Amino acid sequence: MKLIVKVFPEITIKSRPVRTRFIRQLAKNIRAVLRDLDPAVVVNGVWDNLELETRITEPKALKDMTERLSCMPGIAHFLQVDEYPLGDFDDITEKCKQHYGQSLEGKIFSVRCKRAGKHTFSSMDVEKYVGSKLRRECGAAGISLKAPQIEVRMEIRDQRLFVIHSQHDSIGGYPLGALEQTLVLMSGGFDSTVAAYQIMRRGLMSHFCFFNLGGRAHELGVMEVAHFIWKKYGSSQRVLFVSVPFEEVLGEILGKVDNSHMGVVLKRMMLRAASRIADQLQIDALVTGEAISQVSSQTLPNLSLIDCVTEKLVLRPLIASHKQDIIDLAEEIGTADFAKHMPEYCGVISVNPKTHAKRNRVEYEEQQFDMAILERALENAKLVPIDRVIDELGQDVQIEEVSEALAGQIVVDIRHPDAAEDEPLEIAGIDVQTLPFYALNARFKELDNSRQYLLYCDKGVMSRLHAHHLLSEGYANVRVYRPS
């Protein structure tokens, strides 16, 4: 299969050195993301696109390849094509007929040709000749440039002809690794996950920082969604997941700070800690999911007070977004189900919070706070490569993996319902039940405790995370199912 990858249009207006660097980075990212599917994948760069060739033919692998490229920053869209040496107009018509001939009968169609290089003919010459001949020879109902039922598409580059089968859109932006890095403050809710996506989509490599207010279950949930976002949109780069134990910080705020100022003080403590971590990682910008006046701490006066504790640039991709738009985008990118079942602690600690806090009052409240507690939280922060979060769950719980389900055991398919429906898990003689990952922890207690349950997902990431949590909660009848 051959693909022509069209780069993000804003890349094409850069200077020659910058453009070359960005396209080389994109080619490197594509190879990294597709390496496990096809170690021999070939990616070659030209001035405004990349050409990708793979010898794999297995439909599932090709589908995976398409999905990964559709989620890669730096790509505007890509075309699946067949390549031929450029012949005369009759030869071009014949090649188009091979691919489109049967589908044109009784249809209204158009011919679209893009051309680069020096030729004795124009793109319109090709379109007129090929369109006229296909209409006569394929029994088409007619030609319409404005409202065709089928578009016969091709590209001509120098002495090469590309007949286009399909086009797949991607997410645009710049290639990860070509721009600077950021540190995203993650709570796992709608806002922070969408903010992380927006910043990664633009091309900024993003590490994840989680302030743990809610115990191990909350940490595992944020690990899960952070890993999902990275795997889907940023796996060409290795980034870190940073977990900062903030329960003691929160306790100090609850005990020492006036109730009306707790939210602002908590956010200021988070920004102080995040800035220190960013210094350690040589990162110049922080990212949050805040939007104007969505909650009391997010009014303009309060945001200004929060920002003044750091010299870092604080990026807020969602600052002017409506909540429903954020939720809709979370549904689109796949983080909504995580967010719906993620506890949100930052917004529940204040009663009658100040929407226009005064700097001198906030600083007075913080004088009551023992800063040694914040230092202790930073000392105990854990920095783990995002692709190793599963390995870092700790040795406190042994997670058993099995490659074969035995009679009497129940395999629980915890994949997203769409994935379970597209590729149902069927095992001869074994009871397979579907229970989506986002509902598993809440509903597992309803299952028969006398049975053995094997958790299954495609890559084993979510199944291990949830097995760890359930085992930690005292359920001894849980294993991970990893068929060979």
Curated annotation (Swiss-Prot):
PROSITE patterns in UniProt: RHODANESE_3 (PS50206), THUMP (PS51165)
GO molecular function: ATP binding; CCA tRNA nucleotidyltransferase activity; tRNA binding; tRNA-uracil-4 sulfurtransferase activity
Annotated localization: Cytoplasm
Reaction equation(s) it catalyzes: [ThiI sulfur-carrier protein]-S-sulfanyl-L-cysteine + a uridine in tRNA + 2 reduced [2Fe-2S]-[ferredoxin] + ATP + H(+) = [ThiI sulfur-carrier protein]-L-cysteine + a 4-thiouridine in tRNA + 2 oxidized [2Fe-2S]-[ferredoxin] + AMP + diphosphate; [ThiS sulfur-carrier protein]-C-terminal Gly-Gly-AMP + S-sulfanyl-L-cysteinyl-[cysteine desulfurase] + AH2 = [ThiS sulfur-carrier protein]-C-terminal-Gly-aminoethanethioate + L-cysteinyl-[cysteine desulfurase] + A + AMP + 2 H(+)
Binding-site list for ATP: L185, M186, K267, G289, Q298
Catalytic residue list: C457
An annotated GO cellular component: cytosol
Predominant location: cytoplasm
Domain THUMP: 63-167
GO biological process: thiamine biosynthetic process; thiamine diphosphate biosynthetic process; thiazole biosynthetic process; tRNA 4-thiouridine biosynthesis
Highest taxon in the source lineage: Bacteria
Pathway membership: Cofactor biosynthesis; thiamine diphosphate biosynthesis
Role summary: Catalyzes the ATP-dependent transfer of a sulfur to tRNA to produce 4-thiouridine in position 8 of tRNAs, which functions as a near-UV photosensor. Also catalyzes the transfer of sulfur to the sulfur carrier protein ThiS, forming ThiS-thiocarboxylate. This is a step in the synthesis of thiazole, in the thiamine biosynthesis pathway. The sulfur is donated as persulfide by IscS.
Protein name, UniProt field: tRNA sulfurtransferase
Originating organism: Pseudomonas fluorescens (strain SBW25)
